């Protein structure tokens, strides 16, 4: 979240000459800002959901439903909603804008969710994340027993290898060192 994951603490420690674990301030800032991450990762060929950035007070001309609405720099899925129609979209925008002035609206990917940890540039086994109900929101992340995690994920080896490749490439492209976790989706057609 803010300060700890967005690079502010790291930048302060760098200025003060204090050592810390983890990656530097710039890669932390890139990783925490979904808007900035897209600007860095998409040109590197890394697949990401299509979407747009909205600033408070501006309207989207066209939004395909369903869509995902989320604060630009938040963490833990706080303020994230799935909107299936205009009414839900307006409520999702109001919720996301209550956290910050910039939000992302992305296409909804119908599929399975995975997480890949990267340690010193090398991807670890792929983990599948299966909420027992709804999507992997704040409640499902932190309420005991609400999510099933399978490691290694029950997916073909070539898909797991591709997910590990993308996780490593995300870290390399954003300049992330030491350790990270990359979230990935596998759609119903087998696309990552």
Where are these regions (language model features)?
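A short, GP-enriched loop/loop-strand-helix hinge that lies immediately N-terminal to
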Residues: 1-32, 47-50
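A short, local hydrophobic-aromatic micro-motif
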Residues: 21, 49-50, 124, 136, ...
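Active-site nucleotide/adenylate-binding loops and adjacent lid/helix of ATP-dependent enzymes
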Residues: 28-112, 164
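Phosphate-binding site of ATP-dependent enzymes
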Residues: 84-165, 186
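Conserved metal-phosphate-binding beta-hairpin within the catalytic cores
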Residues: 107, 118, 171-192
């Amino acid at each position: 979240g803010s300060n700890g994951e967005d690079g502010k603490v790291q930048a302060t420690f760098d200025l003060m000459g204090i050592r810390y674990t983890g990656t530097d301030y710039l890669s932390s800032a890139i990783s925490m800002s979904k808007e900035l991450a897209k600007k860095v990762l998409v040109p590197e060929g890394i697949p990401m959901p299509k979407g747009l950035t909205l600033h408070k007070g501006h309207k989207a001309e066209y939004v395909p439903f369903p869509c995902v609405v989320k604060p630009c720099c938040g963490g833990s899925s706080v303020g994230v909603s799935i909107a299936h129609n205009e009414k839900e979209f307006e409520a999702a925008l109001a919720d996301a804008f209550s956290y910050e002035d910039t939000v992302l609206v992305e296409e909804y990917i119908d599929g399975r969710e995975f997480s890949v940890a990267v340690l010193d540039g090398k991807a670890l086994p792929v983990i599948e994340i299966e909420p027992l109900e709804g999507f992997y929101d704040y409640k499902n992340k932190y309420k005991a027993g609400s999510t099933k995690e399978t490691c290694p994920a029950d997916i073909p080896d070539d898909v797991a290898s591709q997910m590990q490749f993308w996780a490593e490439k995300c870290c390399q492209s954003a300049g992330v060192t030491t350790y990270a976790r990359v979230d990935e989706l596998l759609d119903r057609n087998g696309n990552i």
